[in-house]
UniProtKB/Swiss-Prot annotation:
Residues with PTM N5-methylglutamine: 252
Name of the gene: prfB
Organism in which the protein naturally occurs: Klebsiella pneumoniae (strain 342)
Family: Belongs to the prokaryotic/mitochondrial release factor family.
Protein's name according to its UniProt entry: Peptide chain release factor 2
Biological role: Peptide chain release factor 2 directs the termination of translation in response to the peptide chain termination codons UGA and UAA.
HAMAP family: Rel_fac_2 (MF_00094)
């Protein structure tokens, strides 16, 4: 005979946790808002304002993720209780196992929704930008920067996020000097915000004919895409705007016009650049949007001692602000803030970052 009580206790536990989340996430208000958004999106003239329509579509996805999951929990727990009753009456182990499997799936869904409580910051739900910058060390550091780029692109792809490379500066021999990636998806900034910092690589360098061990550094800096109406004042006199030809690997010109744009905020030294469009005007708009976002993030850091002036430290890529160490010879990757460690280095470099990200979010970093 199978054990019924532990399963009944799990159903009770999940019901209580689900009820707590309904209150915490304001289920009733979100359900009402979802109905309003759906009604607006059904209007025939909604696409007369494409930006508003896109914003509504994004809001609908975010609301559905909460409302639909809680609805599924409620129905699913009822179904499991019914299956369990059937299993007991018929003394059917197969039906019992089916009920347990369904319960496992519901618990996983609920755990994912509970994890969203970590995302309480004002811009956690926003899309974000990720800057990766190679440290000193030439080709080895530039190759490491490209490995980090690949790691984050793989991670984003696995989460179903979209990515767009805004600007990329090729390395002299291999790798990249720097890259800016836009990451588009639900809570993209919330997921990635604790990845800001210096990443240290230790390995036998493929670029050293003697096969010696090298240590390299690259930095990651994550900042949210902020609304156009965010109150960030930029004095035009504080900006230097340069235009240049967009170029690809090996110096081949992507086009012959000076369409690429670089903006420098002179008081802070912040730089943004964009070359992914043939239109100089569009590239300038994108670079300005990034500058606004960077200045906003810098302002938030000044107000928050734990994130003190990360951008100011970007030029000093070294031991000081390290967050993670990747020692490939010893097959060991360790987060220096949370102590989380793994020996499956290839999986991490292929984008398996959730164990590190979740630990840092739970630690309130």
């Amino acid at each position: 005979m199978f054990e019924i009580n532990p399963v009944k206790n799990r159903i009770q536990d999940l019901t209580e946790r689900s009820d707590v989340l309904r209150g915490y996430l304001d289920y009733d208000a979100k359900k009402e808002r979802l109905e309003e958004v759906n009604a607006e999106l059904e209007q025939p003239d909604v696409w007369n304002e494409p930006e508003r329509a896109q914003a509504l579509g994004k809001e609908r996805s975010s609301l559905e993720a909460i409302v639909d999951t809680l609805d599924q929990m409620s129905q699913g727990l009822e179904d499991v209780a019914g299956l369990l009753e059937l299993a007991v009456e018929a003394e059917d182990e197969e039906t019992f196992n089916e009920a347990v499997a369904e319960l496992d799936g519901l618990e996983e869904k609920l755990a994912q929704l509970e994890f969203r409580r970590m995302f309480s910051g004002e811009y956690d739900s926003a899309d974000c930008y990720l800057d990766i910058q190679a440290g000193s060390g030439g080709t080895e550091a530039q190759d490491w920067a490209s490995m980090l780029m690949r790691m984050y692109l793989r991670w984003a792809e696995a989460r179903g996020f979209k990515t767009e490379i805004i600007e990329e500066s090729e390395g002299e021999v291999a790798g990249i000097k720097s890259v800016t990636i836009k990451i588009i998806g639900d809570y993209a900034y919330g997921w990635l915000r604790t990845e800001t910092g210096v990443h240290r690589l230790v390995r036998k360098s493929p670029f050293d004919s003697g096969g010696r061990r090298h240590t390299s550094f690259s930095s990651a800096f994550v900042y949210p895409e902020v609304d156009d109406d965010i109150d960030i004042e930029i004095n035009p006199a504080d900006l230097r705007i340069d235009v240049y030809r967009a170029s690809g690997a090996g110096g081949q010109h992507v086009n012959r016009t000076e369409s690429a744009v670089r903006i420098t905020h002179i008081p802070t030294g912040l730089v943004t650049q964009c070359q992914n469009d043939r239109s100089q005007h569009k590239n300038k708009d994108q670079a300005m949007k990034q500058m606004k976002a960077k200045l906003y993030e810098l302002e938030m850091q000044k107000k928050n001692a734990e994130k003190q002036a990360m951008e100011d430290n970007k030029s000093d890529i070294g031991w000081g602000s390290q967050i993670r160490s990747y020692v490939l010879d010893d097959s060991r990757i360790k987060d220096l803030r949370t102590g989380v460690e793994t020996r499956n280095t290839q999986a991490v470099l292929d984008g398996s970052l959730d164990q590190f990200i979740e630990a840092s979010l739970k630690a309130g970093l």
